[in-house]
Structures are given as structure tokens and as C-alpha cells.
């Protein structure tokens, strides 16, 4: 039993905190918030025992307390007023209770009541917010209001609260700097107060949470550069203070890598992914940190899913780096330009010379052993654009390793879309590797591998439910056959007298490419099988490319039958004319296929003459 009212207050408060920490699944199934409601009742009792705060006789916040009116919400510099004396101490303790009541109501999904308590907490602390006793509590209350408004999708309001917290932290650290009181200490006897080191740890954790929430807000506002900066700061601080959930940390680092990949900052992307691998490897091996949930390591499915997701980020890294190199070295018909390759080789030395200075500016996670472990992963994967087949092959093999890892979880049974995307990435890795290969027969084999992995996908896919995916795969298979046919034609051109086997092979590849391009084009038809007069913007370019390639394919069919050849030329002309006519009616389409349109116009001009000569020749024979 408590010996005095103050002992009773402290006892009730500590019991309320303990009840607040009880996880929902430990409550009765029909009363998931039982412990929260019990904690709330005790907090209300403590509030009653403390009595009303001066100038706060249960009045509602005034109009000037709303966000944007009070300077507390704008992050303006605060004046230092210490919370000294019984009046100030009473207000602070009341604010602690209002804060916990606010969080309690939010936890039980009573957001308006939660907001009211948190705003009241801020109001009680406003003039003391820069003080050693109150700054941590004030920042935590603002952080919670930031989250609350973010969940309501009032992002600018959330931003104001969170930026105010950041400004207050920075002002406090600059002007005062000593570790402030943790809110729980207001109800602890002097001998149980926290040591400076623990206070510092808790305060830094509060600030880390602030940065984490700001990163999410900036992401939501599409301020991607700022979001990445805050995400990196959060991850770095979590490692420094050893306060992180390995699975969550690794996923956040892998997600951050995608920002750097899109910015073509491959060194930074590689560092994030390497750190993700190392930290993910800690699951089940390290001492549980304060932020780690009990579920850590206990959910095999989630573990394998996250592992697969990180693997997919690695695939994106390898694929984008290879594609970036291809774009830098290809000529206007998509083949390797040796002059561009030589120029990039000359630039490589400069890139390597600048590596150390770039590295100093780049994102860096961890120190000591952790840093060494991350570096060991980094050293196995290049961040430089590959300049030849051997360099491209190294990246390809890394990407393929992660394809197999991703497919372990993302299987066709249960994860149809994800599985297909992974297979498409695998195909894309082969496609870009083929660009670096100089041997045409080996290039053919790479495209053959692509077809072998893509064709089985559409056999089991219901086009009614997976129309877009079906179209993507049909187009990709068609293009792979198209590329193989071009390569076989190039090989045949080098032979003095191509045999019938090669001719048959070319025609079969041609036929397969036509089949899949036609399947793609047929998928654009309406229920009455009529091709649209106006092609949707999302499929305009692929539809025009398909028409162009179908036209070209008919012109490439090898036949000894003059009548058949004339029919093929007529079909080819029909498709070229479609492109020209469509672009005349829809000028916006011309911008999508400028090169193909010019070639189509040429063919529309040339083919009739060629066909007429052919008819004359046929008549003579």
C-alpha cells in the first residue's frame, strides 16, 4: 500500500505504464483493448489526484492553440523558461498524464479524443518546451500529432508538427545540450532517476523517430530527395544507437537503394543493399534491441518474404546498371558502338581516381566490424558501368543469383504477379547481356533462354484477369523471336550459300514472332474483334512498334513461290500504311515512333513499285 498521496500517484502511474505495454494478443480475444482501458482508468485517477493545473480548469484549448496559430506548431525558436516551483511542476506532471492519455486513445482508435489530450499536453508545456524537464515530452507529443494527422492524410499539418519537433531538438542541442529528463522520470523518486547515458539514449531515440516520420511525410509529398536524406539519417542513427529491428532496417535500406538507383548513384545504392544484406543476416543472431518486437525471427514466412524483397532490389540494381551501360554505348540501331565504348574506357580511369573522394561523400553505414562486413559484400559487386562482356557477365551472374533467391519465395502459386515480374527481370538480364556478346550464335542462345522462361507463363494465365501482364509477355516473346530472326539472317548473309535448314530456321522464327505480335495486337480489339480507331496512350507505342515489326517480318519471309511473295509484300504494305494513316489522323502518335514512321513512309513509297515490277516479272514467266 502507498504511504502517501504522492506514493499512490506514482504507484498508479507505473501500473498504468505497465498495462499500456501489454501487447494486444495477450488480451482476451473479445476484449483486445482490455489492458489499454485499465491503463486509461488509472491515468484518469492520477489526473484527478493531481488536481486541475493552474489556468486550466478543464477548459478546452482556445482558438489560438490550433495548429499554425500557436508558435509551437511553427517551429519558431523557444525562450528558455525552466519548469521550477510547484505551479510549473504541477503543470508538467499533468502534461505527462495528458500525453499518455492521448497515446492511449490513439492506440484504441479514438483519434479525436487522442488529439485533444495531446494538444492539451502541448498547451500545458508551451512556455517550458525548451527546458531540460520538458523538451523530450514536448517533442514526443508533437511527433504523435504528426503521425495522427498523417494517418488522416492531412500531410501538411503532419509536416508542420514534425518539422517543429526537429527545430526544437536542434535548438535544444545547440543552446543546452545536456541529456533532458525522460517523461517517466516526473513520477520517479530521486534515487530511481535515470543516469545521463540512459537519458541521452532515450532522447536520441525520440529524435530518430522524428526523422523517420519526416522521411515518410516527405515521401508522401513526393519530395523524394528530402525523403531519402531523412531515411538515410534515420537508418544511420538507428545503427549508431543500436536501436533497430534488423528485418525492418534491412528492408528500409533496400528501399532507399531504389532511390539511388533511379538517380544513377550506383555506389550509394550498392552500399545500401550491402548493408541490408549484413543487417538482415543478424536476424536471430543478435541480442534483442529495445525496438525489436517479439515476432522477430518467429515468422518464417515474413522472413522469407523480406529476403525475397531484398533480392528483388539487388536484381533491379544489376539490371539498371547494365541497361545504363547499354544506353551509353549503343548506336542508333541498338548495336554496340565501338567509339563510344573507347570513350567510356578512357573515362573509367577518371571514375576510379575520383572513387575515394566520391566514397567520402557517399552514404556510409556502421563503424568497425559492421563497416568491414558491409565492405566485404560491396567488394563482390561492381558499381561501375560494365564496358565489355566479362564485366557485364559478372553483374548478370549476381543478378541471376538474386533471381533464384527471389523465386524461392515469390512462386507462381500464390504470388502470380510477383513471380512473373521476377521472371521478366531474369529475361531482361539475358537481353542486356546479349548486347555485350559479340558472337551471334551465343546471342541467339540467350534470346532462346528468354523465350523458354517466358512462354510457359502465358499458358496458365487467364487473359481476362491478367490482360496487361499477358500483353507484356506476348510483346516480349515476339521481340525475342524477332531479335533471333535478325541474328540468323545476319549469320546467313555471311554464308555464300545458306542451306535449306537455315532458311527454314529463319522462317520458323519469323512465323513465331508474327504469332506473338498478332496475339498482342488482337488483345487490343474490342469484344466484337474490331481494332480500335483510337489506341490508348498506355499501349500506343508498343502497338505501333508491333505493327511496324509485323510489316517488316512479312517482308522478310523467304519463299520460292512468287505468288506467295507478292501476298507477303501486300500484307507488309498494309501494315506500313496503317502506321502512316494513323499518325496523320493522330499527330500525337508520330512523336512516339518518329524513326519507325519515317521508315514506314519510305516503304509505303517504295513497295508499290517493287510489287509492280514483281507482277511484270511474273507475267513474263
Swiss-Prot record:
One family name in Pfam for this protein: KBP_C
Localization of this protein: Cytoplasm, Cytoskeleton
Gene Ontology molecular function: any one: protein sequestering activity
Keyword Phosphoprotein among UniProt keywords: yes
Entry keyword set: Cytoplasm, Cytoskeleton, Developmental protein, Differentiation, Neurogenesis, Phosphoprotein
Single GO biological process annotation from the record: microtubule cytoskeleton organization
Protein origin, superkingdom: Eukaryota
Modified positions (Phosphoserine) in chain numbering: 178
Entry-linked PANTHER family: KIF-BINDING PROTEIN (PTHR46321:SF1), KIF1-BINDING PROTEIN (PTHR46321)
Family that this chain belongs to: Belongs to the KIF-binding protein family.
Protein name: KIF-binding protein
Organism: Bos taurus
Organism taxonomic ancestry: Eukaryota, Metazoa, Chordata, Craniata, Vertebrata
Gene: KIFBP
